[in-house]
A protein has these predicted regions:
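Nucleic acid-machinery interaction/catalytic patches
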Residues: 1-358
Length: 358
C-alpha cells in the first residue's frame, strides 16, 4: 500500500521539481509534516531546498499580528478579569479548573466565528432557569457541577451562581480579548478569528508562497474554512483530502456528506491516484488487566517480526494506540529488542512519575 502522503509528495515533485521550495504545505499536525518531508526526500533522491512545511495553527500565528500567549499567563489574565467583574474573593486554585473550561469555550467561539453577544446573552433575557424544566438526573448533574465550582450551600445558590456567571460571560469574553489585544497577545482562537475576519474582508494577506497546499484535513472550523476560501479565490489555495477509505465512500454514511462537501468546495489542482483501501481486518482480544494489554501488544509485535510480516527497520509504519497513558511505560519496557527506535507522541502525567511519589 502506497501511503497517501507519499503519493502527494510524488505528484508535487513530479510537477514542480526543485521549484517545490516555493510552495507551502499545511498539515493538521506536525507529525504529518514530518512524514511528508521524509517521503519527499525519498522521492527526490537528492538534496533539494525544502518547501515550507507547517501546521494550520503555526500558519495562522505567522499571519496574525498577535503573539500566542502561554496557557498559564492566559489563565491568570482571565482570573484577574473575572475578579474585577464579579467582585469576588474566589481563590485562583478554585478558579483554575473551570477557568480552563471557559478558555476552551472562548476558543471555540472564535474558531467557529460565533456571535459572542448572542451566545452569551444575559440570562434574564432567556427563560428563567427553573427546575421544573429539568429532569431529576439533569438537576443532579447541575448541582454536582456547580457544587464543585462554587460550593453553594443551598439549591437557590445553584441558580444564583449560574445566573451571576452568565451575566458577566460576555463582558468576561470581551474584557479578556481587549486586555490581550492591548498587550499584542492572543489565544489560539483569537488568532484564528483575526485572520478569518481579514480574509472575509478580502484584505491583502502577505504570503511569500506561490501555492499554499492543505493536506489531510478532516473536520475544519469556520475560521479555517473562511481562510481556505480566501486562498482558493485568489488562486493560490490547493487542497487534498485523504477520503478513500471504503466506509467514507458509502453514500448512506452521514459523515460522507460533510467529507464530500469539503471535496466539492475545496478541489485539488493536481490529480492524485486514488488508492481505495481494503476494509481493515479487526480482531478483538479480551485482556483482564492493564499490564496484560501491554504484554499482549508485545506478543503480537514479536509474532509479526518472527513471521517476517514486520521489518524492525520499518516499524515506524506500525502504530500502537494505548487506551490509557498509564500503559505508556509498561509498553515501552516491553517493546521487542529487535525494534531499536520508537516514536512516542503522547503525554505522561506528573502524578504517575516517581517524582510525584517523593
Amino acid at each position: 500500500m502506497t501511503p497517501f502522503l507519499y503519493r502527494i509528495a510524488q505528484a508535487f515533485y513530479k510537477k514542480y521539481g526543485n521549484e517545490i521550495s516555493r510552495l507551502a504545505f499545511v498539515f493538521p499536525n506536525r507529525r504529518s509534516g514530518i512524514f511528508f518531508q521524509k517521503y519527499l526526500a525519498e522521492v527526490s533522491g537528492k538534496p533539494i531546498f525544502s518547501p515550507k512545511v507547517t501546521t494550520i495553527n503555526d500558519l495562522m500565528a505567522e499571519l496574525s499580528p498577535y503573539t500566542l500567549i502561554d496557557r498559564i499567563s492566559l489563565l491568570v489574565t482571565l482570573y484577574k478579569k473575572y475578579i474585577e467583574l464579579r467582585k469576588s474573593d474566589e481563590t485562583f486554585d478554585n478558579f483554575v479548573f473551570w477557568g480552563d473550561m471557559l478558555l476552551g469555550d472562548f476558543d471555540d467561539v472564535d474558531k467557529y466565528m460565533v456571535d459572542a453577544r448572542q451566545l452569551f446573552t444575559n440570562i434574564h433575557d432567556l427563560k428563567e432557569i427553573d427546575e421544573f424544566y429539568l429532569t431529576e438526573e439533569q438537576i443532579e448533574i447541575v448541582k454536582r457541577f456547580w457544587g464543585h465550582l462554587f460550593f453553594p450551600s443551598t439549591e437557590s445558590d445553584n441558580k444564583q451562581q449560574f445566573i451571576q456567571l452568565w451575566q458577566i460571560l460576555f463582558d468576561l469574553y470581551t474584557g479578556l480579548r481587549d486586555e490581550l489585544s492591548s498587550r499584542n497577545k492572543a489565544y489560539e482562537g483569537m488568532i484564528f478569528r483575526d485572520v478569518a475576519e481579514r480574509s472575509k474582508r478580502k484584505e491583502s494577506i502577505n504570503l511569500p508562497y506561490t501555492q499554499v497546499v492543505f493536506i489531510g484535513f478532516n473536520a475544519i472550523t469556520e475560521a479555517e474554512k473562511i481562510f481556505m476560501e480566501y486562498l482558493r479565490d485568489i488562486g493560490i489555495g490547493d487542497f487534498y483530502w485523504d477520503y478513500y477509505a471504503p466506509t467514507l465512500q458509502d453514500s448512506y454514511n452521514k459523515a460522507a456528506f460533510f467529507l464530500n462537501d469539503n471535496k466539492r468546495r475545496f478541489p485539488s489542482k493536481i490529480e492524485i491516484d486514488e488508492h481505495i483501501e481494503q476494509t481493515p481486518q479487526i480482531e478483538l482480544i479480551s485482556i483482564p488487566s492493564a499490564v496484560g494489554q501491554a504484554k499482549q501488544a508485545t506478543d503480537i509485535l514479536q509474532s509479526l517480526i518472527d513471521n517476517n510480516h514486520l521489518s524492525p527497520e520499518k516499524a515506524i509504519n506500525t502504530a500502537i494506540v494505548l487506551p490509557d497513558e498509564e500503559l505508556l511505560l509498561p509498553m515501552l519496557y516491553s517493546i521487542p529488542p529487535e525494534i531499536s527506535t520508537v516514536n512516542t507522541t503522547m503525554g505522561y502525567t506528573l502524578q504517575h512519575t516517581t517524582v510525584a511519589a517523593l
